[in-house]
Amino acid sequence: MAVITLASDVTLTDYIQPVCLPHTNTQDRGPLAITGWGNTRAGGGRPQPADILQLLYVNEVPLPFCNDDWKAKVDDDLLPSHICVTGVKLGRSSCKGDSGGPLVRNFDVSSDEVWQLAGVVSFGTNNCGNVDLPLGFVRIDGEVNFWLRNIIGNNLPDYPSDS
């Protein structure tokens, strides 16, 4: 994670919106989505970056199943800090150029406007759009408070309460 200090204020628009950071005790519930500007050409061939921001709704895969799938390809176990997902649409996934991009979760299904950052793109297959292996993301919920308090500073307010 990084904090970027901007020279001027950002004007929020339909295309520029903040994302909420999760609580450390976030429950894994609510729809997930990924966005990115990465390669839109599935399979091989010359990469073609997106002309417009791409959106894909995804489903979470339980970590033990994801670990079993990836264990056949790599000789490392996934960590509890990983989240695995599969695309809802066959042949669609994150791809080269999407690394570090957001995985967001909608915690308020009554509103399409309350999204929290759940993770960042970490790994996938070389064959974009491959549905045989889940996509891998790094969770951020366990790191957010530590990072905010120890890297940014100790004078941040606590999360607002629900009351």
Describe the function of each predicted region:
Residues M1, A7, T13-V88, W147:
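Chymotrypsin/trypsin-fold serine protease catalytic domain
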Residues D9, C84, G101-P102, P134:
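Proline-centered helix-kink/hinge sites
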Residues T11, R41-G43, N67, R92-S93, ...:
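Eukaryotic short linear interaction motifs
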Residues L12-T13, R92, L117, N145:
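Internal amphipathic alpha-helical segments of the cytochrome P450 catalytic fold
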Residues P49-E60, L103-S163:
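C-terminal subregion of chymotrypsin/trypsin-like serine protease catalytic domains
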Residues D77-L78, G97, R139-D141:
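Short cysteine/histidine-rich zinc-coordinating motifs and their immediately flanking basic loops
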Residues S93, S99-P102:
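Beta-propeller and closely related beta-sheet repeat lectin domains
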